[in-house]
């Protein structure tokens, strides 16, 4: 079971992944320590193709039938970040064709896609305040271009898609994500054969995942 939490830069993915990890979920973060982000932002034409080839090899799903929450997926690499780079002239036609060839080999689709939708101004403020590695190369204009591509992507993601208002408080965003996970527990049972637990609060049966805290629907 592959659950992806996606969103523009500065949408709050890292914070939410941390909260879910604290509750017992297996979380797979973007391995940005393996990516030449600093070099890319300094010279995107030189590093765009290499960066995205590295992403293809490192942003891979775990070999498990248990639910895993992933920070982004190759979908955003191919259909959000890559189109912006191509439009800006940072990749050649040969690089584009080569990348597409390998993308077809390494691509994978999530079972559930949760998108954190955050206003650009708020995302920009968050980026400036947090000082995360690689943020120094992000501009407000670039953020806007990514936002436009994300709006196209979420219309064609090949799985269940859920939009979460990321302009809310951290706590409310977390509640909304947990609600999505609880309401889709039937998919988790199909993935790893979980037992079924009675729910007295709603008078129906729900599958109990390996994480007891998400079995409580009260």
Q: Could you describe each region identified by the protein language model?
A:
Residues 5:
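Hydrophobic anchor at the beta1->P-loop junction of P-loop NTPases
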Residues 124-200, 208-211, 215-218:
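NTP-dependent small-molecule kinase module
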Residues 8:
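P-loop (Walker A) phosphate-binding loop of NTP-binding proteins
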Residues 47-107:
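Glycine-rich phosphate-binding loop used to anchor ATP phosphates in small-molecule kinases
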Residues 21-61:
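Conserved substrate/cofactor phosphate-moiety recognition/catalytic segment
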Residues 80-149:
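A glycine- and Lys/Arg-enriched "phosphate-lid" helix/loop adjacent to the NTP-binding pocket
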Residues 13:
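Conserved lysine of the Walker
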Residues 16:
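Hydrophobic positions on the alpha1 helix immediately C-terminal to the Walker A/P-loop
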